[in-house]
Swiss-Prot record:
Species this chain originates from: Oceanobacillus iheyensis (strain DSM 14371 / CIP 107618 / JCM 11309 / KCTC 3954 / HTE831)
Gene: infB
UniProt KW keywords: Cytoplasm, GTP-binding, Initiation factor, Nucleotide-binding, Protein biosynthesis
GO MF annotations in UniProt: GTP binding; GTPase activity; translation initiation factor activity
Low complexity: compositionally biased ranges: 59-84
Protein name per the record: Translation initiation factor IF-2
Chain positions covered by the region annotation G1: 202-209
Region of interest: Disordered: 51-114
CDD domains found in the cross-reference section: IF2_eIF5B, IF2_mtIF2_II, mtIF2_IVc
Keyword presence, GTP-binding: yes
Amino acid sequence: MSKIRIYEYAKQNNLASKDVINFLKTENVEVSNHMSAISDEVVKKLDNKFKAKPENAKKGQNQKQSNNQQQNRQKQNQKNQSKPNKNKKQKGPKKNQQQERPAAKPAETPGKITYHGTLTVQDLAGKLNKEPAELIKKLMFLGVMATKNQDIDDDAIELICGEYDVEVEKEIILEDTDLDKYIEEDAEENLQERPAVVTIMGHVDHGKTTLLDSIRHTKVTAGEAGGITQHIGAYQVENDGKKITFLDTPGHAAFTSMRSRGAQVTDIAILVVAADDGVMPQTVEAINHAKAAEVPIIVAVNKMDKEGANPDRVMQELTEHQLIPEDWGGNTIFVNLSAIKNEGIDDLLEMILLVSEVEELKANPNAKAFGSVIDAQLDKGRGSVATLLVQNGTLHVGDPLVVGSTFGKVRAMVNDLGNRVTEVGPSTPVEITGLHGVPQAGDQFLVFKDEKKARQIGEAREQKQIDENRGTQSTVSLDDLFEQIKQGEMKELNIIVKADVQGSVEALAASLQKIEVEGVNVKIIHTGVGAITESDIILASASKAIVIGFNVRPDVNAKNAAESEKVDLRLHRVIYNAIEEIESAMKGLLDPEYQEKVIGQAEVREIFKVSRIGTIAGSYVTDGKITRDAGVRLIRDGVVLYEGELQALKRFKDDVKEVQTNYECGITISNFNDIKEGDTIEAFVMEEIERK
């Protein structure tokens, strides 16, 4: 039987909820209020206490009722004979109800239900063996008003099932082009231990490359002449008889671009931090990328051979990013090493093996091969060449496979040592040829039994991608933010904050996190000081985030990446404006307004100081055009120093209205003379735009 609440029991037995609660407390039954649920055993205790007296009272009442019935029976006898059906209808149901109540057992509530699409209240009631009215009542308690034929959302279904301690699972119907549909689940007994896949990340000059080289040259499989003869973006080393696979990804951008395509190839991230330098901006960036991928982090404190090495300082700085050493009560492993002197390399490899053992990394080597693309290119002699990482199963020469939106048959395989191989197992990188097209890094691949099926699915996936590219890309933009919130598509708004100084970053991030509209929270996934970079844009694209710049500008690569990835870039000079814009967008209050459009950039190549005029910047227009009526800002090292108006724009000695790309000009900025060679002057106009 299902549990009932105290107020329901009290109502059924004409009792006060308070009396029931007081009695249960004397019996040491923990209840908080009239809404508390009680078990069958507790119900029996209550019956023994409260039902004895009512039954005696009922006997007296029944006797009086029976006497009255006998007196009236003779009077009603004629009516009963003349109208038998009517009386049967009246008495029948009451009699049946009294007889059937103890006999009829309610259907048991299932332990688990599954569904796909949506459910109406009536459908859910049928699955739970409950009355729709009972579910409608519970939905009302949850603040959801619904009729029995009305669809209810997934959250409401989960809450209702939670009330009955029923596990709920939503079935996802896969399309024929989804590779997940063809991946078979492996039985536990078929799984075997596999090597860990490790990515090394960190600041640009903290010794990532040196560490990779040290591991590569000291731990290459013994007996291989010439060591690594070919670099394929990944390699394996052996330590204590166990293999470890290292991915040589070119920076954090590639790491995240792979993740954005659904590839979760990394098992462990190694964060390299220089002992003499501490945590740097790219270190923080690497931490955020690794956390977003939800992989364990091992901190490698490098350059311990230097005089200024201070590992304690590194530990202290990393605690601010929730990486707390084991010695300080945390769960992050720290390894001190010197990559250039090959000191501590064995300790690092030992820790990697320890973490991989804890993570229980397993795969089925006998399954059809499945994995991800590490890198791919078009070679003049060999055609399409792709570096694959086998994540499950074994890949053989001659296997037909689908890779991303292309397909083919494995013609040849070369391992990380440059040797031709005929088969490779789980967690092994290999370079293959034989594909019809060039896949992208992060694409998934799967081996099929026959080439015809692989071709059919590969062509269908290619057509699907073409159709998707014609449509709009699913990204987050302030323009349609309110619409997404209204449709329930968003519960969290991801934001990346970049500013000119750390104080501004912290102030802006703190203010943005306080905004909450319609149950949508603001989540700051990355902050940093300095110009907006391409890496920021790729992280934003992978995480569906908006980038906010305060007193900083995007570099050329970042600007191009933002356009191609359709990432929303918002640049501000007043913190309040940034906060107001986000809050207004979330509330759906963005009215048509003016938006800045950058029309050109000029590089300052020479400075002329004239007493009556001020500083004249001899400039060369590198992009777009500079117009006389445009607003300008002076940028130095990616940071905006001044924003104002042009005082004069000249070509030789003549005043001009505009100067095009690849032409020189003289620029004077109103009320500003602190101009230096190498500065960038950016021209912009304000255009009226209408919010969609």
